[in-house]
Amino acid sequence: MRAALSTFAIAFVVVACGPLPGGGNAVTAASVAVQSSDLPSGMQKCDVSGDIDAYLAKVKAKDPTHYTTIKQEWDDAKSHGATAGQVAVYADTADHCAAFQSNSSDITTATFKLVVNFVIEFKDEAAAAKGYTSESILGFSPSTIKSSGSVPVTEGTKTGLSANSIVLTLELGGQSFYVAVWQNKKFMSILAVLNFDQATSTKIATAVNGRIK
């Protein structure tokens, strides 16, 4: 279970899309990713947040193993049609932001409130759908989420996100995990919410999904 979540945590990326119908504002990686307004008060945006290249530069020195893994997986994702990525990380204190940056490879060890969101933009919706259904994007595939066997998952429209979606929820050793991965239009979003109640976690995912136009 922890191995599956660790693999999943390696993989979060946000997107930039085309112009909204009837308006001049573009949907961007920054506008889709988790925002402070999506979260309960007190959560801090970690300095490691940013586009995927900036994220990699920031984690390289403190977690070289994570850097190498994500760099290889991001290069692979681009070969399958990914064109842009953004990472949003929030924690309940500045010290916990630093703890994440030093151990990004395994967020399952976090006993504090943590939100990590990667969203990927693909060249088109078909590439995004294939990324979700057929590829391992940034180390993720639906089978990875389901590999723990006994852990309950919800898939498809029942998640409230999209037809291509999967949500895992788990309480383990005093920790709570909410992991949602979904494809909507040109975007694939990977979201991990740790140590929040399920209603709050679902609200965060819904807010992110609602900004994909």
Pin down the residues of each PLM region.
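A short acidic-to-branched-hydrophobic micro-motif
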Residues: G85-Y132
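Short, well-ordered beta-strand elements
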Residues: V116, Y178-N195
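Active-site beta-strand termini and strand-to-loop segments that position acidic
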Residues: S102-S105, L170-L172, W182-K185
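Short Gly/Thr-rich strand-loop-strand
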Residues: G42-C46, I52, A126-Y178, A207
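N-terminal "mature-domain start" segment
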Residues: G18-N103, V151, K203-R211
